[in-house]
Amino acid sequence: MFLDSRKGLFPMKLGLAPLTLFRPPPLDLVRYAGEAGYDAVGFQLGLQDMPVSPLAGDAQFLKEAKALLKRWNLSVMEVSNIVFEPERTFDEGRVLIDFAKQIGASIVQATVWDDEQDRVVERLIALADYAKGLDLGITIEYMPYSQCQGFNEAYDLVRASERSNVHVLLDTLHFSRSGGVLADLDRKEASSYSFIQLCDARAKAPAPEDLRYESVYDRLPLGEGALDLGAILEKVPTDLPVSLEIPCQRLKDLPLVEQAREHLRIAREFLAPYAHRWELEVDPVT
């Protein structure tokens, strides 16, 4: 069981996703995660319709980030996002994979905004092969408002790539809003899930044109919505890394570190009946 004098007694290690705090500067996010008592943190250095952040190749930023991670005894779960868009280049993905290796991340996320599947698969294979050489993989995040709208589309990319280091992200909001049902998690294909991002949400989905707003700005803390999170947690493998991605309007006026702390408090209370199943090993950056 996990025991830390600052973080308390809790067997499930939890990461803080950048979107939970509405994407603050990365070094600030590390500080907030550490002060709030998280075990891990994510770095978001790539977004749709934007160039990869120059921080991904900045040696001074890497040095400062590593120092903060060590100070707060934090691991890095994910680096995001490799963005599959028609005009993207291999090097834009490579620099994120390189950063992930240097910072000690276990996951490199990818999103798909290109409806030419053959082109996506070709680029995915090239980046997966490069990542494998660094002992990393690529995890595809499906979103109902992207060109990879649900698990079936993401799994098609996994299968087409024929690469063992290509996986799928289970985001509980996107799982629900894309039409996912619990029985889907019993399919053998569900073994391709390698990472879970938790949030809650209202029972009624917004209109299709509002799905992105809900995803980026209006999720709910665990237990405050209608998603069957408990049933999901009972079905998923216990070796999946777990991160909180919960941008929430109710908490947005609190100082960012207090938002982080409150999300963690609520999450631990909600997850307590399931947390004993997790024995996740995520080593801090040295």
Indicate where each model-derived feature is located:
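Alpha-helix N-cap and loop-to-helix initiation/capping positions
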Residues: S53-F61, R88-V95, D115-E122, S146-Q149, ...
